[in-house]
A protein has these predicted regions:
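Short, charged N-terminal beta->alpha structural module
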Residues: 2-24
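Flexible gly/pro-rich beta->alpha loop and the following alpha-helix that scaffold active-site loops
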Residues: 18-82
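Short glycine-rich anion-binding loops that position phosphate/pyrophosphate groups of nucleotides
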Residues: 53-56, 87, 165
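Cofactor-binding loop segments of dinucleotide-utilizing enzymes, especially the Rossmann-like FAD-
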Residues: 6-8, 33, 86
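Catalytic nucleophile loop
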Residues: 74-98
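Amide-donor transfer/coupling interface in amidating biosynthetic enzymes
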Residues: 5, 100, 113-221
């Protein structure tokens, strides 16, 4: 199985999601967009993972328009996508939905109300966003909470608003490079947030593995 990972920041990795795909025999190709140049072709790709970004899908940057068009082309080709946070929002916007600002943020560890906890466990999940999806009619909600739709499927695609990939080192890179002020604005202590994330790692790894199983089941359904 060949998996293409699209990331948007050099401090990001696919973390627990990459581990779960690799445990199933996948080889991962990683492309940093837009820094590494145009989005790659997807011939011979079995699954795509689109990761998060500090940007909003609604920002006027040319690369976002390019990525929206690319996701539409991926959809027409029938290649399944797993979207994470910004990746979920770009699937939503590319396929007929909208993305709106929440008027605040959701940062920290939160549970979700899941339609099927075998497919999408209740969590807790690490959240780090200030936009949310308004889904197209073709989408099916798989989990939500008071802040946002937290997981959905549309066709062969599966998307989550939270960050199942994040471990302690990943969060530390975020806090060091771009995230400490946002965490404080949410009323959290960055050091405690990091400690909570490290403590949660074993359970978070298992939940991420469950999500990859769900993504593959949706792909094959």
């Amino acid at each position: 199985m060949r998996v293409l990972v699209i990331r948007h920041h050099d401090v990001d990795t696919a973390g627990f999601i990459a581990e779960a795909f690799e445990a199933r025999g996948a080889s991962l190709d990683v492309h940093l967009f837009p820094d590494d140049g145009p989005l790659p072709g997807f011939g011979g790709v079995d699954h795509i993972v689109v990761m998060g970004s500090v940007s909003s899908v609604n920002d006027p940057d040319p690369w976002i328009a390019e990525e929206l068009a690319w996701v539409r082309a991926v959809d027409r080709a029938g290649v399944p996508v797993l979207g994470i946070c910004f990746g979920a929002q770009i699937i939503c916007a590319a396929l007929g939905g909208r993305v709106e600002a929440m008027g605040g943020n959701e940062i920290g560890w939160f549970t979700v109300d899941s339609a099927d906890e075998d497919a999408v466990p209740a969590g807790p999940w690490l959240e780090f966003h200030e936009d949310r999806c308004l889904l197209p009619a073709a989408a099916t909600v798989l989990a939500r909470n008071d802040a946002a739709v937290q997981a959905f499927r549309i066709g062969r695609h599966f998307a989550v608003q939270f960050h199942p990939e994040v471990d302690g080192p990943q969060l530390k890179r975020w806090l060091d490079s771009m995230g400490a002020a946002a965490v404080q604005s949410a009323g959290l202590d960055p050091d405690q947030f990091l400690a909570d994330t490290i403590r949660e790692e074993p359970a978070a790894r298992a939940r991420a593995d469950r999500l990859v199983a769900t993504a593959l089941a949706i792909r094959d359904s």
